[in-house]
Amino acid sequence: MHKDQIISQLIKEKIITISPDKPFTYASGMLSPIYTDLRLTVSYPDLRDMIASDLSNLIAAEFPQATIIGGVATAGIPHAALVAEKLHLPMIYVRPKPKDHGKGRQIEGRFSENDQIVLIDDLITTGGSVLNAVKATEKDGGKVAGVASIFTYYLPDAKENFKEANVKYTPLLSYPELLKKENESGHITSDQYDILKTWHEDPWAWGKKFNS
């Protein structure tokens, strides 16, 4: 596994940005002192190859029953394609909503009711987008074995949402691992470390306090 190298390159290439004084706003409305733009990883051949290799090994270990790899549009699609190639498995991808033209499909690619599908997304914050993809796949008759991602913040909301949906998810990298690496490498100050740790414990409370 290449966890340390991947995290180091994510930091080096500023794919992960830390800004405690000017926090970012996520799609959920959550304020955060950190932003992870994993869409940029496709621009770095060595990085994307390490990610694909480690994700493939992770899926083979955690979901040995997998017969199809699914990409969650849009950021999960390139990584799903690379993993499907390495595992020599068929691939599908899932849109956020059905097309409004043509055949009106939400899922592209073929699968049967006997297939075991593993969906890949780049990042899990609250889990909303990938769990919508799970619902869409199951609505079309697919069986979702679980979800894999490059990175997760391991936020309480995500844990609760996956538990409620009864969906297994396995990340390659997690926020606690990133925070530990950032702290050890000296890329962040002790004050920044404390801010990032406090945010992780209760993101909504942190955002509310920041705005007060």
From Swiss-Prot:
It catalyses: orotidine 5'-phosphate + diphosphate = orotate + 5-phospho-alpha-D-ribose 1-diphosphate. Orotate binds at residue 125. One of its GO terms (molecular function) is magnesium ion binding. PROSITE patterns: PUR_PYR_PR_TRANSFER. Pfam families: Pribosyltran (PF00156). GO terms for biological process: 'de novo' UMP biosynthetic process; pyrimidine nucleobase biosynthetic process. Keywords: Glycosyltransferase, Magnesium, Pyrimidine biosynthesis, Transferase. SUPFAM superfamilies: PRTase-like (SSF53271). It comes from the Bacteria. Pathway: Pyrimidine metabolism; UMP biosynthesis via de novo pathway; UMP from orotate: step 1/2. Gene3D superfamilies: 3.40.50.2020. 5-phospho-alpha-D-ribose 1-diphosphate binds at residues 95, 99, 101, 121-129. Its cofactor is Mg(2+). Its EC number is 2.4.2.10. Belongs to the purine/pyrimidine phosphoribosyltransferase family. PyrE subfamily. Homodimer. Catalyzes the transfer of a ribosyl phosphate group from 5-phosphoribose 1-diphosphate to orotate, leading to the formation of orotidine monophosphate (OMP). This is Orotate phosphoribosyltransferase. It comes from Lactobacillus johnsonii (strain CNCM I-12250 / La1 / NCC 533). The lineage of its organism: Bacteria, Bacillati, Bacillota, Bacilli, Lactobacillales. The gene is pyrE.
